[in-house]
Amino acid sequence: MIKGLIYLFLFRCLEGRLADYEEESSDLGDYSLNGQTDEEYGKFPSHVLTEKETGPMDEIRCTNDDYTYNIKLNVHLQNYAIQAIADAAKPKLGMNLKERDAILSYFGTIANELNADLARLGAQIVIGLKHYKAEDFIDTNSFDTSCEIRDPVMDRLDSTFKQLKDVYQDSMGLRLFVWTCPQLTSSFETMKIMSNLNCGRIMGVLWQGADATRTSIKSTILEAISGVSELYLDGALPVDRVFSNVCRFCSKCVGVEPGVIGWKHPDVVKLIHAIPEEDTHEHGYDH
C-alpha cells in the first residue's frame, strides 16, 4: 500500500513533464524491420521514472562503472487477457482504469518488483507497451482457439516466431506474449522461450489468472536473460544463483550504443514504472 502511494505521488509530481504515450500502429507490417525506429533507441517510455542510487555498489554488480544496463521488454497480450486485467483492476486496486492504464499497472508492478531485485546487479527492465494488443500486431487466424487440437503456448509461439522472423529478421529484441484459452488442462505448457540471433528472445506465457500468471511472467523474464528456469516460483529470486548469467547477458547483449535489446544508462539508477491513478478525463490517446 505504501509503495503504491509512493508511485502515485511520483506519477502526479512528474506528470507535467511526462511525454505523451507512444502512438500505436495497428499493423506489424507498418513497423520498421529493426523492430523500433532509430529515434526510439535509448529513450525511456513516458511511464518510466529514474531514481538515482546513491548507496555503495553491491559486490556482485555486473559493472563497477557508473552506468546501468537497461533491458527493453515489449509485451503483447491476447484480448481476453487484456479484458481480464482491466476487469480485475477495480476490485484489486479499487480503481476504474482505462484499458491501457490497467495493463501498465499490471506489468509496471511486475517490472518494479523485478527491478528491485535486479538493482543489485546494475540491471533494470524497461516495459514497452507499443502493440500491446497481440491481435493487432500479429496474424492470429491460424491459432487453435479451442486449445484442444494443439498445445497453445508451443503452437502460437512457433507461429509468432516465424512471423517476427520474416519482418524483424535478426532484430526481434525481447518480446513477451500472453496467450489465452477458454479452459486450462494440466497437459498444457504454461511458458516457453524461443531464442533468435543478436540476443533476441520471444517468450510465451499462458494466462492462468492475474496472480498465477504474474509469477509465470516474472519467472519467464528471468529465464530469458539468465537461462535458469523456474525462478520466482517460490516467491523469491535467488540473485546469488543467477547473477553471473544475467551479467553475461548484459555484457554481451546491451551495448554502449542503444539498440533493440536495450542500452547503457550513464548513471547508477533504479527504474520505477509509474502506476496510473484513476482518471475521469481524456488522456488524448486512443485505445
Curated annotation (Swiss-Prot):
Source domain of life: Eukaryota
Keyword RNA-binding: no
GO biological process: adhesion of symbiont spore to host; cell adhesion
Signal peptide limits: 1-19
Listed transmembrane segments: none
Gene Ontology cellular component list: cytoplasm; polar tube; spore wall
Keywords, ordered alphabetically: Cell adhesion, Cytoplasm, Signal
Annotated localization: Cytoplasm; Spore wall; Spore polar tube
Homology family: Belongs to the SWP7 family.
Record note on quaternary structure: Interacts with SWP9.
Its job: Involved in adherence of spores to the host cell surface and in infection efficiency.
Protein name according to UniProt: Spore wall protein 7
Taxonomic lineage of the native organism: Eukaryota, Fungi, Fungi incertae sedis, Microsporidia, Nosematidae
